[in-house]
């Protein structure tokens, strides 16, 4: 294939699947689930258990799709497990007070149902306990329940998942057992509404098969949006290793959020992002030595074998490994580590010293956590093991230094991300205590929700909750016939570049959009730059979008993803214009509004599309505890959760 053929969109390799552009497939169901990740699977299972006929549309392969498609090593917020010593209600109140702009309602639901969701997985075939007594007698183990805990062995809130690598196949088998119709390789491109009108009841979705290009129309009484959060808005480079370390699954582009926006759903926290991020400079996730997260509480030593001291949250030295997992320790390697390097007290490189760890901790880090964490089971645990790495003998280099410009592995300041995780949530759909969005018939779960921050258990719990509520709603309404004009308009939009010549590939289109976001909506923003950014995005729509070539269904999928990222970028800029104040918590800096976190701006900014205009509004940070809701988490949960029983201690 010549370079000129590639540039003009000709000369693609022969496509291995039958191509059926334009062919329509019409289906009808009670509950439609958009996205078959963790949230979507739990939603579909729970809706089916409530008697609903359920269809799942998944862009990838549900058996291993989503951010946790390859596994999970620890399961957080399990406050109702039999060995937990922490009070759920107090923890929820404390979390809501400490973490503004994190949706406390979602955190509470996660705390209430996290352990239930884990035991659900156990019931379906994922044995998460230490049933073979490999860790008998270890401080991390509760002898009665045989549960292994992580991070804090006193409160016992985080559970190590012995067979977490198998979580998606377990969920997939349960979907099939319940008769859920799973349509893999179907990417949702738009939502159906009553009469085809924006702001009306959502009655299903439209999409394409990413292998054949055929069109799907699914009519549903209730729709659950569980497609993941958007990524690749500021950083786009698929060719360099490590490019996805901060982006979750690079296939998560936010097409669900974009589809909901276009029919008038209310979004919030869209102005939030963080940076700089690794981009193409990152190390493979957890594939280097570390003292945190999956590697916690591993010893660190310098090149001469000198141990890096650990401290608690008050700065007191923790002498023993066991002290690091004590209640309220807040254990971390000394924050003085970089100064110690500069003073010559620590000699680079540093290493994660697995051989010096107590045997149970060493086996837990390498054989349990690394072996079940989705990002590491194959690329780290399997590959390193096959190469001869032995955790009983070998240390692993830990790239910790700020002596290099920007720090080891960091990208430029303009490289940002909106990916949720680590107790940090950003933009998405606004929901109420029923997981219902601002549009009738549309529910949301997982990272599709604004402020969702619970990681894997957050997805599982909001998914099972939304599944129950959507099934309830579906039982009370009739099906409506989709609007033919809305379907035809969507088909015209998605197929407009099929068969057309062009000189722009989808990668160039995506990279160009990301570059505009870096320049005009980076770490420091102003009204003039943001409005200039909107102009440039519109210019891309008018020019490069109409010059993009689509040679097969795969490129059609990527092209439509570019359109979704364009839409998400426009929403982000509009949200950034609406917040006329800076915020340290949001990592949001307006140079023309430099005051940091003024009280009058301590609120959620909301946006929706109405009559082709962006309409902004606001919600109190605790809107879920304000009228018309009750004033406590417990009262609201018990009034809305639609759960008859809860597994508890």
Label every PLM stretch briefly.
Residues 1-31, 645-647:
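Extreme N-terminal leader/targeting segments of oxidoreductases
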Residues 31-56:
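N-terminal Rossmann-like FAD-binding beta1-loop-alpha1 element of flavoenzymes
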Residues 49-70:
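Glycine-rich FAD pyrophosphate-binding loop
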Residues 193-216, 223:
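Conserved beta-strand-loop-beta-strand element in the redox core of flavoprotein oxidoreductases
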Residues 225-285, 456-469:
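Glycine-rich loop(s) and the adjacent beta-strand/alpha-helix scaffold that form part
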Residues 475-554:
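Long, amphipathic alpha-helical stalk/connector segments used for oligomerization, subunit docking
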């Amino acid at each position: 294939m010549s370079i000129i053929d590639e540039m003009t969109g000709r000369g693609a390799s022969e496509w291995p699947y039958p191509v059926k552009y334009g062919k329509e497939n019409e289906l009808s169901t009670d509950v439609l689930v958009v996205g078959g990740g963790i949230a979507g699977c739990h939603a579909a299972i729970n809706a089916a258990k409530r008697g609903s006929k359920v269809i799942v549309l998944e862009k990838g392969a549900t058996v291993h799709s989503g951010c946790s498609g390859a596994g999970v090593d620890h399961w957080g917020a399990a406050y109702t497990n039999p060995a937990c010593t922490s009070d759920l209600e107090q923890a929820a109140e404390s979390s809501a007070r400490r973490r503004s702009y994190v949706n406390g309602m979602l955190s509470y639901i996660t705390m209430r149902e996290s352990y239930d969701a884990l035991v659900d997985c156990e019931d379906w075939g994922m044995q998460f306990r230490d049933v073979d007594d490999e860790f008998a007698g270890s401080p991390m183990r509760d002898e009665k329940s045989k549960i292994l805990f992580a991070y804090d062995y006193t409160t016992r809130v985080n559970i190590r998942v012995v067979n977490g690598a198998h979580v998606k196949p377990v969920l997939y088998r349960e979907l099939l057992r319940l008769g859920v119709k799973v349509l893999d390789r179907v990417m949702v491109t738009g939502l159906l509404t009553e009469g085809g009108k924006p702001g009306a009841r959502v009655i299903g979705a439209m999409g394409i098969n990413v292998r054949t290009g055929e069109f799907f129309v699914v009519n549903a009484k209730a729709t659950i949006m569980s497609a993941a959060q958007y990524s690749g808005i500021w950083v786009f480079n698929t060719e360099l290793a490590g490019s996805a370390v901060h982006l979750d699954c690079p296939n998560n582009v936010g097409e669900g959020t974009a589809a909901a926006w276009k029919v008038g759903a209310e979004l919030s926290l869209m102005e939030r992002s963080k940076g700089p991020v690794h981009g193409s400079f990152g190390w493979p996730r957890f594939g280097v030595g570390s003292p945190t997260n999956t590697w916690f509480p591993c010893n660190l030593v310098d090149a001469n074998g000198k141990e890096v001291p650990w401290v608690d949250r008050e700065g007191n030295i923790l002498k023993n490994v066991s002290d690091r997992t004590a209640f309220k320790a807040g254990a971390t390697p000394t924050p003085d580590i970089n100064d110690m390097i500069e003073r010559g007290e620590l000699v680079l490189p540093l290493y994660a010293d697995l051989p010096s760890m107590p045997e149970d901790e060493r086996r837990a880090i390498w054989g349990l956590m690394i072996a079940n964490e989705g990002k590491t089971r194959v690329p780290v645990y399997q590959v390193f093991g096959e190469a001869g790495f032995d955790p009983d003998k070998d240390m692993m280099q830990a790239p910790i230094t700020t002596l290099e410009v920007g720090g080891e592995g960091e990208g430029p300041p303009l490289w940002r991300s909106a990916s949720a995780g680590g107790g940090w949530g950003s933009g998405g759909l606004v929901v109420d205590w029923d997981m219902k969005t601002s549009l009738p018939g549309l529910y949301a779960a997982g990272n599709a929700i604004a402020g969702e921050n619970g990681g894997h258990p957050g997805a599982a719990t909001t998914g099972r909750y939304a599944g129950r509520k959507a099934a309830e709603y579906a039982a009370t309404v009739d099906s409506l016939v989709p609007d033919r004009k809305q379907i035809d308009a969507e088909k015209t939009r998605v197929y407009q570049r099929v068969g057309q010549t062009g000189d722009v590939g989808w990668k160039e289109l995506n990279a160009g959009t990301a570059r505009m976001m870096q320049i005009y909506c980076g770490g420091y923003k102003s009204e003039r730059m943001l409005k200039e950014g909107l102009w440039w995005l519109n210019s891309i729509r008018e020019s490069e979008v109409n010059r993009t070539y689509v040679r097969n269904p795969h490129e059609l999928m990527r092209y439509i993803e570019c359109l979704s990222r364009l839409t998400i970028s426009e929403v982000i800029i509009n949200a950034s214009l609406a917040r006329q104040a800076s915020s340290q918590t949001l990592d949001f800096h307006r140079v023309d509004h430099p005051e940091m976190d003024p009280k009058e701006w301590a609120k959620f900014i909301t946006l929706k599309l109405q009559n082709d205009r962006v309409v902004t509004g606001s919600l109190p940070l605790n809107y879920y505890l304000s009228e018309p809701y009750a004033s406590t988490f417990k009262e609201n949960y018990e009034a809305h959760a639609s759960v008859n029983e809860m597994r508890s201690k």
